[in-house]
Amino acid sequence: RDLESPANGEWLGLAVQVEGAHRAPSFLHLQSGGQARIRLMRGDQPLLWATQLPYHDGIWLVKSLVAASPAQASVPPIDSPTLEALRGLRGEARYKAWSRYFVETLRTSPGSCLEAGRWLLRLSLAEQVPAWQPPQSHDPRERVLERWRYRSVGRDALLPDWRFYSLEKVLDDDWVQWLDWWGRDNDALIALRRVEDDEGRVKWWRKKAREGELPPVLALRLNCLDACVILDGHCRLRAGLLENVAPEILVLCAYDEQPMPVDTAQRERVLQSLAQRVDAPVRRGRRPLDSEQLNQVLLRLFDDRPWPRVLTRARAVLKEEQWCAEVRDWLAARERLDALEPIIRRVE
């Protein structure tokens, strides 16, 4: 069902209920273990290994960067008939159509991440950084990314606001990646495969970007990484980057609902304060409440909708020795054992 703002009817996202009595592991799923060890799996194939630092200073990622086969992909490649069916849609009509396309595709895809429970799809759009802010990089691709800042469409106090302050991490195609949670790496967007500028799909999407028909990128929120991983759209993101066209990002997350407690005494005090504020003469230096501000306060005051709590589910099946051995073998095969010690010791 579509979620709309109670204030102005603005589209906020798509809520999805996946039926099922038990949460069996989806094809794309997380595993966890002691010492904050994490592994993202595509079937029986690891996509990445991760481990958090003890004081939450950041997280190490070791990525396989293996592209999914068509049979394993979370979303099959978008084809021309699909693009033609959605061509020309703009604004909310476009957002709703692509949201439903991805949800319906995930429902039927063998490589899906959907499990039984509630899911939420929110759209983030790019905002331009002020022109006075100097670029930090000499790489033209990175300079484009530094100008893109994302936040979710619609303003709602209960729904998550997915903000991407920098997309530069998607250019990092090293096997090993460090996310500094005290720096600019909160809410990062993580690529799960390498993309070359001369790939056929990149060239095709560059043409669609110039036509204004570039579909959104689909990402999955993982709280344990404080980041989102790209489920579908690696080539579209690269095409948008090369054409200086910021693609929309649809962020998928699991959630549950918590009842919103109602404090009638507090509500009465706020109402009395508002009445006094409205009736009192305007004092110097104090702006009067306009009708829009007053309506916003009243809407929040009487908003008793359940609070959506974002979740990341994982199976606690990892053994410390197994995780360390896999990471060691993977790095050794790629001549990156220089990165092993800080990862195993969980230090920067």
Give residue spans per PLM region.
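Solvent-exposed functional surfaces
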Residues: 1-55, 59, 237, 245-246, ...
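Short alpha-helix boundary/capping and kink motifs at helix termini
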Residues: 18-229, 248
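Residue-level signal for functionally critical sites in structured catalytic/ligand-binding pockets
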Residues: 129, 232-236, 298
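C-terminal or late-domain output modules
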Residues: 183-196, 215, 219-224, 241, ...
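A sequence-level detector for short glycine-anchored, His/Arg-bearing signature motifs
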Residues: 227-243
